[in-house]
């Protein structure tokens, strides 16, 4: 299945149903008072995280989703039916962004998490709501309010504990094949990896972590060169980044310069991502003797002004790979993922109960209204269905 990690869709919540103007007219009760019902609320639009999905391909062609409108009110004090909600299923790790305001509406990072992205309109009021001691036959009603409509940008960010960085052909796909059951394509030409892939590394029977492999970066990636930095967003939720470096590049390029290129592109993309814990791992030491590999790594670190804090591995032969994986597992356990801070709900400025009260209080009565035929013909007793006539 094609990997799609971005989608732009149009969502429309349902409008609220209108109120009804109606009067009770039955045998022996010719003027029984107002009985217009309220409309129904419009349907909402939700997103729900589904662990069985791993791509946004479902939203590549179908891009418009609309909830049902609320029904209008009817006579006999019948309230209109509420519009049906719609729920869109997305992969775990999806972020919802308002495309117009660029506001992040939320992240769906757990299976079954449900998020409201468009609120349906509220119902209008029927004329029965407006009856009072001075207005016994009201002809006022209110219409339902429009539902929210927005263009929604969906971005899928893979949930992994470890992310891998490096130039093309640094051995990232070979490494993930060596430590997990994932089988990304491996070849001796650049950009063999075209889409991100995930693998589960099991250190022992009870401990494991998820590792993400993304396409390699090249110089100028932040400006769109190569595959660009489009896939770097998949590393934003990782505990630690593994910077894989070919210690003996076949093109005879300088590994120190290659490290500097990746570091520079990372900082240009995101300072937050650049400040994540990052481990330097020299790969392909099987092409050199142990002494030569150690000497070359020390020379590179001295030129970069860094400490002797690095790993020497061979993903192809598996040399020192187990040690690296166990150290990664220990680091993850010592630094658990921080839960997102819960934001206290803020009091909304617009309250529908207040809105309805305002609609009722803003009604204006004129002398023409009071001189109408129905103004003084209805009494409280009519609501019981029997007209009471008092003997003089």
Curated annotation (Swiss-Prot):
Keywords annotated in UniProt: Cytoplasm, GTP-binding, Hydrolase, Magnesium, Metal-binding, Nucleotide-binding
An example molecular function term from Gene Ontology annotations: magnesium ion binding
Domain OBG-type G, chain residue ranges per copy: 160-333
PROSITE patterns referenced in this protein's UniProt entry, alphabetically: G_OBG, GTP1_OBG, OBG
Subcellular location as annotated: Cytoplasm
Binding-site list for Mg(2+): 173, 193
Domain Obg residues, every copy: 1-159
Main location: cytoplasm
GO biological process, one term: ribosome biogenesis
GO CC terms of this entry: cytoplasm
Biased composition (Acidic residues): 365-386
Residues the entry annotates as binding GTP: 166-173, 191-195, 213-216, 283-286, 314-316
Assembly: Monomer.
HAMAP family per record: GTPase_Obg (MF_01454)
Family membership noted in the UniProt record: Belongs to the TRAFAC class OBG-HflX-like GTPase superfamily. OBG GTPase family.
Function: An essential GTPase which binds GTP, GDP and possibly (p)ppGpp with moderate affinity, with high nucleotide exchange rates and a fairly low GTP hydrolysis rate. Plays a role in control of the cell cycle, stress response, ribosome biogenesis and in those bacteria that undergo differentiation, in morphogenesis control.
Protein name: GTPase Obg
The species this protein was found in: Histophilus somni (strain 129Pt)
Lineage: Bacteria, Pseudomonadati, Pseudomonadota, Gammaproteobacteria, Pasteurellales
